[in-house]
């Protein structure tokens, strides 16, 4: 098979590269999306705990970068696009902590190797799963999300912002967060016939 990447055509030189190209080809049933967790130049303990726990929920479809990276997602996204393409990942979380924006997570979605959207959120508190005396989630399990309130509703009937009392820009951010989290932790598609 020949892979068309914009203008260049890459042919596999050996069996290993052929298998790698076949793995990236379009499929009838797509695999779960892979996520990359990247630490910025400075991260606080809160951000480190949050990223570790989010990556644990995403396993086995999570790649955690160990080294710190000088990355500013909103200023230059080329490194994010490179990492996504190199690791065959379409989701990234970049953790950082700066003086003006402490304890931040930047969620990034890629489509076709390009940044589709980004959402920046602050971390107020982070607690490790080890602090809770319960069973830990198994690998590959999906978390349960409950979105409550008028900010998360997208029904046109109830989308009257004046009646809901929600700010239109804030409501858009809440809907964006809902979409991103559900896409991020969607997991493996299950076959309805089995």
Predicted regions and their residues:
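Phospho-regulatory, Ser/Thr- and acidic-rich intrinsically disordered linkers and terminal tails
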Residues: 3-194
């Amino acid at each position: 098979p020949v892979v068309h990447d914009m203008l260049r055509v890459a042919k596999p030189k050996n069996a290993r590269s052929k298998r790698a190209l076949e793995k990236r080809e379009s499929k009838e049933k797509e695999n779960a999306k892979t996520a990359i967790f990247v630490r910025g130049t400075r991260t606080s303990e809160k951000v480190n705990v949050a990223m570790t726990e989010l990556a644990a929920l995403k396993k086995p479809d999570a790649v955690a970068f160990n080294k710190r990276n000088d990355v500013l997602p909103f200023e230059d996204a080329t490194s994010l696009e490179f990492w996504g393409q190199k690791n065959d990942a379409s989701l990234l979380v970049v953790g950082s902590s700066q003086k003006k924006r402490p304890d931040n997570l930047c969620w990034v979605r890629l489509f076709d190797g390009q940044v589709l959207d980004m959402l920046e959120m602050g971390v107020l508190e982070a607690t490790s799963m080890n602090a809770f005396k319960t069973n830990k989630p198994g690998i590959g399990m999906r978390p349960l999300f409950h979105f409550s309130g008028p900010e998360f509703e997208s029904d046109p009937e109830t989308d009257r912002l004046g009646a809901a009392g929600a700010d239109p820009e804030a409501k858009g951010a809440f809907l964006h967060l809902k979409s991103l989290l559900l896409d991020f932790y969607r997991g493996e598609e299950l076959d309805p016939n089995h």
